[in-house]
Structures are given as structure tokens and as C-alpha cells.
Regions:
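Sec-dependent signal peptide recognition
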Residues: 1-7
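C-terminal motif of bacterial Sec signal peptides marking the signal peptidase cleavage site
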Residues: 11-14
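Bacterial signal peptide processing site
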Residues: 16-20
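Pro/Ala/Gly-rich low-complexity, hydrophilic intrinsically disordered segments
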Residues: 24-29
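Periplasmic peptidoglycan-binding/anchoring modules of Gram-negative envelope and division proteins
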Residues: 31-45, 61-94, 122, 159-162, ...
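Extracytoplasmic
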Residues: 39, 48-50, 56, 78, ...
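Glycine- and acidic-rich phosphate- and metal-coordinating loops
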Residues: 54-56, 91-96
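Periplasmic OmpA-like peptidoglycan-binding domain that tethers envelope proteins to the cell wall
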Residues: 66, 96-167
């Protein structure tokens, strides 16, 4: 009899966990669709249980600058609107650079770029406690650094949106 009760309990517990996972997946899928609709100037993709957002290359930063260009700010405002609507998520912001400058300089600059993006999203009411920054320097290029176009593509920030498992 105990075995039947334990088995029934485990079955019910696994059903509850499945529903919770399904709810989280639905939440993330809904957010993904809204981001795709709101952000024409960004590449939005689902990677496992997260959403990755990369804005069009070459429009975010000048060489050696951590200040976002003005033309990207309306897109960040729309991005913030979706993030605010789906507030059960956390956002990892990674900054990147081209290979101009020393590795130490680039790591520091990439962290400043991530912080700059965080501050802009924060100015659009995205809660600061939902965002985390990381500077990658020149370590993860998306293009060759031997042309100005390639270097411009590498001067970027990327966003990884994760469901807050504490919810």
C-alpha cells in the first residue's frame, strides 16, 4: 500500500513540475514573439531556455566609445517596453569590442558598454535588479577585425533573457 501511495505522490509531483515547465516555456515563447514583432533592427532567437537579442551590427558604438548611438535609442525603448511587460525574466548584458586597443583596455571598455546599455534600459523603467552585465572584450568576435565593417560588427552588446526561476 505504501508503494502505491508513494508512486501516486511522485506521479502527481511530476505532473505539477511539467505544468510549471510548460508555463515557463509559454511565457518565454510569448516574450519571444513580442520581441520579434517589436524589434526589426535586432536578431531575436531562442537558445535552449533563453532568448538572445542582438541589435544590428555597426549601429551601437563608435570606436573606443561606450556611449550608445542616438539612432538605436528608439529600438531600446521598444525593447524595454517588452521587458517591462514580461517582468519574470532576468537579462544578462554582455559587452564586446573589436581588437583595437589592448586586451585589458578592451575588457574594461566592453564592461562599460554593457553598463551603458543597462543604464539606458533602466532609464526606460527596466528594474535594475533584473539586469546583470559582463564585459567580454575582444574574445568573442562575430566578424574578422581586418576591415572597418568587421570591427563595427564586433562593437556590440548582446542580451540573454532568462526566466527567473524564483517565480
Amino acid at each position: 500500500m505504501r508503494i502505491v501511495v508513494v508512486a501516486a505522490f511522485l506521479f502527481l509531483a511530476s505532473c505539477a513540475a511539467s505544468k510549471k515547465i510548460s508555463k515557463q516555456q509559454q511565457y518565454m515563447n510569448d516574450q519571444y514573439r513580442e520581441l520579434k514583432n517589436a524589434l526589426n533592427e535586432a536578431e531575436v532567437s531562442i537558445i535552449k531556455d533563453s532568448i538572445k537579442v542582438i541589435f544590428s551590427y555597426g549601429v551601437l558604438f563608435e570606436t573606443s566609445s561606450d556611449q550608445l548611438k542616438d539612432e538605436i535609442k528608439p529600438a531600446f525603448q521598444r525593447f524595454a517596453g517588452v521587458l517591462n511587460k514580461f517582468d519574470k525574466t532576468k537579462v544578462l548584458i554582455t559587452g564586446h569590442t573589436d581588437n583595437t586597443g589592448s586586451p585589458d583596455y578592451n575588457r574594461e571598455l566592453s564592461e562599460k558598454r554593457a553598463i551603458s546599455a543597462r543604464q539606458l534600459l533602466n532609464s526606460y523603467q527596466v528594474r535594475d535588479d533584473r539586469m546583470f552585465t559582463w564585459g567580454m572584450g575582444e574574445r568573442v568576435p562575430v566578424a574578422a577585425n581586418n576591415t572597418e565593417g568587421g570591427r563595427a560588427r564586433n562593437r556590440r552588446v548582446e542580451f540573454v533573457i532568462l526566466y527567473n526561476v524564483k517565480e
